[in-house]
Design a protein with these regions (language model features):
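Short helix-loop capping/hinge segments that flank enzyme active sites or metal/cofactor-binding pockets
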Residues: 18-23, 27, 69-127
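Histidine- and/or cysteine-centered catalytic micro-motif in compact active-site loops
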Residues: 29-30, 59-61, 140-143
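Short glycine/threonine-rich loop-to-helix capping motif typified by GTGT followed
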Residues: 37-39, 66-76, 147-152
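Short connector loops at secondary-structure junctions
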Residues: 53-70, 101-102
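Acyltransferase
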Residues: 35-59, 82-88, 112, 116-133
Length: 169
């Protein structure tokens, strides 16, 4: 439910605290092993501190296929959206982009359609979580972004949530 307050009452209402105790779900996915020590310690401390609001569950089995399907969609879309640039200025693209576009051009329409269809099937399986929980907690990254401009780091922790289109904090 959405509750609206006038600006004159918003501070006093905020000081009262939340209207309900939010409940979150957390999975230590297979990518948890990538997280750096400080980030792991911080996340585990946060989970322990708010244990009445956070439940830890085993990762659903179909999550393991999401990274594969996410890659098919991502690389096929890159190949489609950068096709003209790739043909004319391939050498100006990073090696990562060149490789991703090359792979994206090799996926069949069937593989792409399966990857899109798997979103719907996965979300249908997962949506019941939001009957009992308000959101998912997940590290955004394994730690601080690398120095320099060559990489922004890894998106492994966010791929599942991006693929499913679900809220994640």
């Amino acid at each position: 439910a959405t509750i609206h307050y006038s600006t004159e009452n918003i501070l006093s209402e905020t000081k009262k605290g939340p209207l309900f105790d939010p409940k979150f779900i957390f999975y230590k996915t297979e990518h948890w092993k990538l997280i750096d020590k400080k980030s792991r310690e911080s996340f585990e401390y946060f989970i322990k501190s708010f244990k009445k609001n956070i439940e830890i569950f085993d990762t659903p089995s179909y999550f393991k296929d999401i990274h594969k399907y996410h890659q098919i969609i991502h690389e096929t879309d890159l190949a489609n959206n950068f096709s003209v640039y790739f043909k004319k200025f391939k050498k100006k693209l990073s090696k990562y982009m060149q490789d991703a576009i090359t792979r994206g051009n090799k996926y069949s329409a069937k593989e792409y359609a399966e990857a899109i269809d798997f979103i719907k099937r996965s979300y249908e399986s997962y949506q019941e979580v939001f009957e009992d929980y308000h959101g998912v907690l997940s590290p955004a990254s394994p730690g601080v972004a690398p120095t320099g401009l060559k990489s922004t780091g890894t998106a492994e922790f966010n791929k599942v949530w991006s693929y499913l289109g679900t809220p994640c904090i």
